[in-house]
C-alpha cells in the first residue's frame, strides 16, 4: 500500500490547495473536519481509491461525496474513455499532461508536480456540473445517486481486503 502523501482541494474557482501530510502521525484535524462535514461537497475522480486512503490513514469518513468517474460512466455511455484527462479535454477543451501521475509526492514538489496536482482538482467542479446536466437529461441522476450511496460500502470492502466482485456468480 502506498502511503497517503498529499490531498488536493479546490473550491471550483481555479484555486488549488495542495496539502502534504505528516506521514509520521497523519494529524490533520482541520482537514478531517472538512472531509467529515456534510455541508461541504467533496468531488473526486475515482473516489474509491482516494476515500479508502483517507479512511485508512486519516481515520475519518468522507461525507457528501460526488464522483466524476462514476458520473461519466453513467452519463457518457457513448464512450469507453472515462479518464480525467479525457473529461478535461471534452468539457474544458484543455489538454493536460499526465506525465507526473506516477511521481514521488512524498518529498519536496517541483513546480511541474504542483501544476499536475492542481490540474487534478481545479476542473472537477465544471466537469461535475456538465456531467450532472447529462445525467438529468438521460434520466440517470437517481441511479448515479444510488451508486454514490454504495461507494462507502465498496471502500469498506476494499479495506477489508475483499478484492473479488461479491456480486459476480
Feature locations, PLM:
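Acidic, Mg2+-coordinating catalytic module of metal-dependent nucleases/exonucleases
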Residues: 96-156
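Residues that form generic nucleotide/phosphate-binding pockets
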Residues: 34, 57, 87-91, 134, ...
Amino acid at each position: 500500500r502506498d502511503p497517503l502523501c498529499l490531498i488536493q482541494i479546490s473550491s471550483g474557482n481555479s484555486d488549488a490547495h495542495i496539502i502534504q501530510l505528516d506521514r509520521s502521525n497523519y494529524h490533520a484535524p482541520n482537514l478531517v473536519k472538512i472531509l467529515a462535514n456534510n455541508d461541504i461537497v467533496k468531488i473526486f475522480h475515482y473516489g474509491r481509491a482516494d476515500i479508502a486512503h483517507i479512511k485508512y490513514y486519516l481515520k475519518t469518513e468522507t461525507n457528501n461525496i460526488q464522483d466524476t468517474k462514476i458520473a461519466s460512466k453513467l452519463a457518457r455511455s457513448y464512450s469507453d474513455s472515462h479518464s480525467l484527462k479525457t473529461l478535461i479535454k471534452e468539457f474544458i477543451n484543455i489538454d493536460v499532461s499526465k506525465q507526473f501521475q506516477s511521481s514521488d509526492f512524498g518529498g519536496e514538489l517541483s513546480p511541474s508536480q504542483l501544476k499536475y496536482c492542481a490540474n487534478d482538482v481545479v476542473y472537477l467542479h465544471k466537469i461535475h456540473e456538465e456531467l450532472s446536466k447529462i445525467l438529468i437529461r438521460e434520466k440517470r441522476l437517481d441511479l448515479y445517486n444510488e451508486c454514490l450511496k454504495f461507494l462507502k460500502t465498496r471502500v469498506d470492502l476494499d479495506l477489508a481486503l475483499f478484492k473479488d466482485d461479491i456480486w459476480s456468480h
